């Protein structure tokens, strides 16, 4: 707990905190396959073979988020908050003392006219302040919404080694609010074939849907 307090006092982003610590509280449960639906005005989400876990909404006006949960990935709740909505870890794939993690955050800003690129640039600036290096970006879409994939090296911190990190950022507007959902997955052994396949599944199958989606 002392390490967690020290990190908080250093004002690191909450998502970064979970990424650095790997979290340490596991919630038992089994993911259930959710309907493969999307906002009909914005495109279709991609289907993947892993079951989908629905991420709890904190308000009914928020978008619905769903994330694939391949075998061996366990849901964590230690740092769940208004910002950090979901995290999971796979201890079976641990390497160099670090287990791969997947973390989802959700932020919002009033209005729906914000340029998505401005929001993407803000997120990348935050990563640079956090100490990320070797950043590369590529534009994509997720469920029809503008998205960006950022790959980078996460800095070592204490006993936590440097990590290969991929972040998927998606911007979607609903009613009078713009939301930025961020999915980050990382490992200290990115060449592990099981991790590579799991990461692809999680990133490809992540969903952002309208608040009233089935």
PLM region descriptions:
Residues 2-86, 92, 160, 186-214:
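N-terminal targeting sequences that direct proteins away from the cytosol to non-cytosolic compartments
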Residues 97, 110, 114, 124-128, ...:
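Intrinsically disordered, low-complexity prosegments and terminal tails associated
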